[in-house]
Amino acid sequence: MSVRILVVDDDRAVRESLRRSLSFNGYTVELAHDGVEALEMIASDRPDALVLDVMMPRLDGLEVCRQLRSTGDDLPILVLTARDSVSERVAGLDAGADDYLPKPFALEELLARMRALLRRTKLEDDEAADSVAMTFSDLSLDPVTREVTRGARRISLTRTEFALLEMLIANPRRVLTRSRILEEVWGFDFPTSGNALEVYVGYLRRKTEAEGEPRLIHTVRGVGYVLRETPP
């Protein structure tokens, strides 16, 4: 059975372009023109993934993310943001989106990101049952319940943030190269240009240091990142 993707965008040309491209690549595609219609369709027949524009009438993409996440729905979500709007990307990740893609975008990149997102989702399902909670310092991550805590404080992470932190905590005090992280978290076909990794590391730091806790995720300049108690 093919993967079902719901594309939500108020621009008909964008919807049709994505429908053609995704269908050609073997996906079953459904379309919605705004957030209200999208939530109704998800409630009646849940898709496997969601491609979601941010700026839409009636109900925007950020509110769709928030409403889905508030009910505990972990539907994989790729949001489409304005090209130069850093604040929009920030808001999308904070609302619970798993990944973002700035407009205008190459269809090849959207397909690559969707493949990577679906791979991460499948790996979660396949591996969670065999996993045990992992800890480093006062940071704890449970792959089964998907709970993350720093001390007594619970931390809410998106799917991509969780996958990145899981990789770091599974390799404590070991420097992970940028290319290795991109390959394992995003997939081999993820475009290595751009600053997606840096964006996600920034968000992990913000969330894990929200109450003034010492930094655990450190940059190794020119190489990658490492999880350790003190800077390298």
Curated annotation (Swiss-Prot):
One GO term (biological process): regulation of DNA-templated transcription
InterPro entries: CheY-like_superfamily, OmpR/PhoB-type_DNA-bd, Sig_transdc_resp-reg_receiver, WalR-like, WH-like_DNA-bd_sf
DNA-binding residue intervals: 131-229
Modified residues annotated as 4-aspartylphosphate in this record: D48
GO function term, MF aspect, one: transcription cis-regulatory region binding
Post-translational modification: Phosphorylated and dephosphorylated by MprB.
GO cellular component terms, semicolon-separated: cytosol; protein-DNA complex
Keywords: Cytoplasm, DNA-binding, Phosphoprotein, Stress response, Transcription, Transcription regulation, Two-component regulatory system, Virulence
Signal peptide bounds: none
Role summary: Member of the two-component regulatory system MprB/MprA which contributes to maintaining a balance among several systems involved in stress resistance and is required for establishment and maintenance of persistent infection in the host. Functions as a transcriptional regulator that recognizes a 19-bp nucleotide motif comprizing two loosely conserved 8-bp direct DNA-binding motif repeats separated by a 3-bp spacer region.
Identification of the protein by name: Response regulator MprA
Organism: Mycobacterium ulcerans (strain Agy99)
Taxonomic lineage of the native organism: Bacteria, Bacillati, Actinomycetota, Actinomycetes, Mycobacteriales
Gene: mprA
